[in-house]
UniProtKB/Swiss-Prot annotation:
A Pfam family annotated for this UniProt entry: Globin
Amino-acid positions noted as binding heme b in the UniProt annotation, renumbered to this chain: 87
Gene: HBAA
Residues at which O2 binds: 58
Domain Globin: 1-141
Disulfide bonding pattern of the chain: none
Protein role: Involved in oxygen transport from the lung to the various peripheral tissues.
InterPro entries assigned to the protein according to its UniProt record, in alphabetical order: Globin, Globin-like_sf, Globin/Proto, Hemoglobin_a-typ, Hemoglobin_oxygen_transport, Hemoglobin_pi
Similarity comment: family membership: Belongs to the globin family.
Database matches in PROSITE patterns: GLOBIN
Keywords: Heme, Iron, Metal-binding, Oxygen transport, Transport
UniProt GO molecular function: haptoglobin binding; heme binding; iron ion binding; organic acid binding; oxygen binding; oxygen carrier activity; peroxidase activity
Free-text tissue specificity from the UniProt record: Red blood cells.
Protein name (database record): Hemoglobin subunit alpha-A
Length: 141
């Protein structure tokens, strides 16, 4: 459960990174595909090389969805309901991949904003990313 301070921390982080959705999203995906190569199986039609237009486009979608969730932090479920349907019913993404993506996103934030990622902010972001993952897997059966 996200506390008031957690919500403030998350909103502050996304306020600072919002203008970098495309770059941070692409970097997050590249890290995930490199570190966890099994995640590539969901993207057989993508050019997975560094700088690929497809990775940049999808990365921007990923971070834009996280920004939307942060902007609607009191209703993450409502903000991501359609994505939950898509990932559970059509794409059938293994739920563990959301955690892997979240870990890679935290690394990207830490690289680009090291002073921002205090232990408290890190914990808040981790809780938020877990909440996002829970929403995205809520419709799995």
């Amino acid at each position: 459960v996200l506390s008031g301070p957690d919500k403030t921390n998350v909103k502050n982080v996304f306020a600072k990174i919002g203008g970098h959705a495309d770059a941070y999203g692409a970097e997050t995906l590249e890290r995930m595909f490199t570190t966890y190569p099994q995640t590539k199986t969901y993207f057989p039609h993508f050019d997975l090389h560094h700088g690929s237009a497809q990775i940049k486009t999808h990365g921007k979608k990923v971070v834009s969805a996280l920004i939307d969730a942060a902007n609607n932090i009191d209703d993450i479920y409502g903000a991501l309901s359609k994505l939950s349907d898509l990932h559970a019913q059509k794409l059938r993404v293994d739920p563990v991949n959301f955690k892997l993506l979240g870990q890679c996103f935290l690394v990207v934030v830490a690289i680009h904003h090291p002073s921002l990622l205090t232990p408290e902010v890190h914990a808040s972001l981790d809780k938020f990313l877990c909440a996002v993952g829970a929403v995205l897997t809520a419709k799995y059966r």
